[in-house]
Regions:
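Outer-membrane beta-barrel porins/channels
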Residues: 2-279
């Protein structure tokens, strides 16, 4: 058995770097177009969901061929800086477990041949959630203005806070069987063999992203985005395993034994039956 339980939390004030500022920078560097990020089919376009969610929840917007975060101001040379002090928080929670259940049976044939049978089941669960929060210590430092092509201000607001959350979950079940035989054909001599069937594990993965950005002021508004429900189902099969052994006892002097185990890892198989892209 195993467990994967963990809670992490961090908080602090920062006036030099911003989570959504980095998101905007990476989206600019990757060359994602605003029309692609804002499309109703953006989550199926191959663009990482993080940037789609961030853009559609107004965490960053295009400006002079780059993206600028709601927490940033822009110099004349198109370089960006954090506009003021931010109260930043990060949280992560993981949980999960792995268990193996086995049913055993044994047979004895005249104290000469012994047979053991195991029927087993593996189960696993895992979930991962993390969030990033940024809140303006003073919203007046974070003026956001949108202008038309003539330079006229068409919208004026102040960044107040944002939250980005990502969730992932996995569950799986696998089945296997083992059989072992030990035989004592004559005194002092013992032979044995074990066989484990391939383990076929069915695994289901799901994930989801969501974002929210709050603006205050004259044209203040709350923008939010929620990704579709991503899902991937796949099957993982491990190879058959077998082992053989023989031993002979030389009275009170010692024992001679030989063992051999075989397993062809080239027979491992992975097959996906449903897949929704997310990188």
């Amino acid at each position: 058995t195993a467990d994967y339980n963990q809670d992490v939390y961090a908080n602090g004030l920062n006036s030099t770097t911003s989570f959504i500022g980095r998101m905007a920078y990476d989206a600019s560097a990757a060359g994602y177009f605003p029309d692609d990020l804002g499309s109703s089919k953006a989550y199926d376009s191959g663009i990482p969901w993080k940037y789609v969610t961030g853009y559609q929840s107004a965490m960053f917007d295009p400006f002079n061929d780059i993206y600028v975060a709601a927490t940033e101001k822009v110099y004349d040379d198109n370089t960006c800086f954090v506009a003021g002090e931010l109260d930043q928080s990060y949280g992560r929670r993981t949980s999960g477990s792995k268990y193996e259940y086995i049913v055993n049976a044994g047979l004895n044939f005249n104290d000469v041949v012994y047979v053991g049978i195991n029927l087993g089941m593996n189960t696993m669960t895992y979930s991962y959630e993390e969030y990033f929060k940024e809140q303006a210590v003073n919203s007046n430092d974070f003026l956001v203005e949108l202008k038309d092509e003539q330079g006229n201000i068409i919208s004026s607001s102040y960044f107040n806070r944002m939250k980005y959350k990502s969730a992932y979950a996995l569950s799986g079940t696998g089945y296997f069987a083992k059989i072992g035989i030990i035989a004592n054909p004559f005194k002092g001599f013992r032979i044995g063999a074990t066989l484990q069937t391939p383990t076929r594990t069915e695994i289901n993965e799901t994930w989801e992203d969501e974002g929210e950005t709050v603006f205050t002021g004259r044209d203040g508004k709350t923008w939010s985005a929620l990704s579709p429900y991503g899902e991937n189902k796949w099957i993982f099969s491990t190879p058959l395993r077998a082992s053989f052994g023989a031993a002979y006892t030389l009275g009170q002097f010692g024992t001679i034994s030989a063992d051999y185990e075989m397993c062809n890892y080239g027979k491992m198989r992975y097959r996906s039956s449903l897949y929704t892209d997310r990188s």
